[in-house]
Amino acid sequence: MKHLLLVRHAKSSWANPGQADFDRPLNERGHKDAPMMAKRILDRDITIDSIITSTALRALTTAEYFAHANEIPKSKMIQHDFLYHAPPERFAKAIVLIPDEIHTA
């Protein structure tokens, strides 16, 4: 059975009002909280085989913190443009695309 953990991106910055939403980075708090949340997953003895993420900057940066904590190389992260502002059916599509060898993402 596959297990899917849903994690929202860490706190993002609104410092540049003209910046495209897709390109908003994490703010200082986001950079502090993301590794702490990744550690909480590890502390619960949950082993993540892969990370699936939107390519939006704040989501990708958060995913990289989780990848680092779980020793998952960036090359093994699965990135989907279609997850940005995705309705439920796009998440279903991402789930179907998970390779068989991945048990927890």
Name these PLM-found stretches.
Residues 4, 101-105:
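Generic beta-sheet signal
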Residues 45-47, 98-101:
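Flexible, charged surface loops at secondary-structure boundaries
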Residues 82-99:
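Short phosphate-binding loop-to-helix
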Residues 2-3, 7-86:
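Active-site-proximal alpha-helix that buttresses catalytic centers in soluble enzyme cores
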